[in-house]
Amino acid sequence: MEIKDLQIFQKVVEYGSVSKAAKSLNYVQSYVTVRIQKLEEELQTELFHRSSRGMVLNSEGKTLLFYSQNIISMVDEMIKVVQDCDNPAGSLEIGTVETVNKLPSILSAYHKKYPKIDLSLITGVTEDLVDDVLNYKLDGAFVTGYYNHPQIIQYEVFEEELVLISNYDKLPFEELKNKPLLVFKQGCSYRAKLEGWVRDEGEINAKIMEFGTMETILGSVIAGLGITIIPKSTISLLEAEGVVRIYEIPEKYSKITTVFIHRADTFLTNALQKFIETIKNAPETARKL
């Protein structure tokens, strides 16, 4: 059994199709078919339920998937350990929620000091980013409002104040709470805070409108479509320009902490260690939780 076979197997699982897996790997379809058949012959069992609609794992396939993920993760870690050196190089994939206002200064300081590292930044909501870290898809992530997890180490980066923003500058505060709530999809900590506040008010029936980017949410608020909550530091310039109005919300919902997380069992490459050091050396000192 070869590592390559396990990688091909995982791609077939991901796409549910030999042809799609082959295309993603730049292999001919017949080669992928042969490698899957070879794997099944070695294990003396079929791994998929096959139909005209695609390929779905059977119970034996699910078992192999679990172990293959661990094996490939360990191989990747081994390569990182062997290749790691005093001058970090290679790649680092970091996730972040969209509203980490202080992130650019951290990334800039890191890139200036370690220019050989290929740093990729992936944006998403907290719940998705946590899942990606747990599933080894990201080396680490900046997330908000997170709680302790046995497989994750987290560092507190900074605490921020959430505020409600609107362009309804002539409306009383009580009327604002019935305007549409402009939010990210489920899994966003800001959305959870806003919905929790609205829910606790009891008599509020606000419409929920989901958006994909913070830029779109802010543009919609400015256009008068609805209201949202956002870190005060992110919106201060727009407030100064007079295009939005800020309202304080109850302290129970206004405090939110940004943390940097990584898996507890992942080998800390020099690249990741130096990234954590850069976070700690930022004006807002990170501390391990």
Curated annotation (Swiss-Prot):
Keywords on record? DNA-binding, Repressor, Transcription, Transcription regulation
Q: Which GO terms describe its molecular function?
A: DNA-binding transcription factor activity; transcription cis-regulatory region binding
Point out the DNA-binding stretch(es). Answer: 18-37
Q: Where are the transmembrane segments?
A: none
Query: Where do the HTH lysR-type domain residues begin and end?
Result: 1-58
InterPro entries per record: LysR_subst-bd (IPR005119), Tscrpt_reg_HTH_LysR (IPR000847), WH-like_DNA-bd_sf (IPR036388), WH_DNA-bd_sf (IPR036390)
| A family per Pfam | LysR_substrate
Report the protein's function.
Answer: Transcriptional repressor of soxA gene expression.
Q: Which PANTHER family match?
A: HTH-TYPE TRANSCRIPTIONAL REGULATOR, HTH-TYPE TRANSCRIPTIONAL REGULATOR GLTR
Similarity comment text for this entry: Belongs to the LysR transcriptional regulatory family.
- Protein name (Swiss-Prot/TrEMBL): HTH-type transcriptional regulator SoxR
Q: Organism, per UniProt?
A: Arthrobacter sp. (strain TE1826)
Name the lineage.
Answer: Bacteria, Bacillati, Actinomycetota, Actinomycetes, Micrococcales
Recorded name of the encoding gene? soxR
